[in-house]
Amino acid sequence: MKKQGFGTTKDGKEALLYTLSNKNGMEISVTDYGAHLVSVLVPDKDGKKRDVVLGFDSVTGYETDGSHFGATIGRNGNRIAGAAFELHGKTYQLAKNENNNLHSGPDGYDYRLWNVEEADDSAVTFVLMSPDGDQGFPGNFEVSVTYTLTDENAVEIHYEGSCDQDTVVNMTNHSYFNLAGHDAGSIENQTLVLKAEQFSPVIDSASIPTGEHAPVQGTPMDFTSEKAIGAEIEADFEQLKLTGGYDHNFILDKAVEGSIELMAVASCKESGITMEAFTDLPCVQFYAGNFIAPVTGKNGVFYDKRNGFCLESQYVPNAINQEGEEKPILEAGDTYDTTTVYKFIF
């Protein structure tokens, strides 16, 4: 494990970068600022290492990043309608962004300096204390995020937390993948399989789900067999028009509820790199990077629309306000414990 400086935050605190490697030539780097996944170096079919996630060279880029490159999102990922929810008869008001609450508002966990609990050659654990009322959520919530790089070429992200009151917790990682390399431009020729026969249609461009679980069959939302991301992204289909391309929740076909199972397979023919994604959560948000704001990232590379895609494990967005959905409620004294894995084949 290598530790080095990653720049200084706006309030004068030093951020650190931790680099892990395995026996097969893979490397990942993570930072204590926002518990971001900064880089994932994977050997391609010719043995050349490619960095397959978008990001920045120092903490400065992450402080102003609105796309959440590589971010640990908390307490709640995705959207809560009207930036409010009710729990045990009490209404909790959250900060509004985009007229709802997206990724827990402007003061997300990805804009904070985390503590490092432990670090070794294969894993780093970051810890954050989120006080009662933080972002509008109830309860003192202590959470850890552990990044592990295995010799099976898997990046494991394990979340563990507890709270002294019942609260909402729905954390995720917002990495943008480009299996040709972060500097390779469009991801539309890369292929995807999603283990999901249903998706969550949205009401309008604000991307709040209707509450319906709609079949993907016969629609451009069908990724049950391998398909290029760009094959139907511009189709004359209302759901894609509302969100400028894919940015939808998919309900995973789970064999056993709560078990870690395959959720997606993405591949790039040009690099020869394949990524398998696994989670124990019920859903995944597939986002094709439709609204990546033009920005200069790592090594001076210019990022733009659809230069990376996200596979964000989660509960159904706005489930806390939806009848009939599994709600992301962590009860006082219980342990929040979930794992998402991105495994690379090369």
Located regions from the model:
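An exposed, glycine/acidic-rich loop-and-rim segment of catalytic or binding clefts
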Residues: 1-346
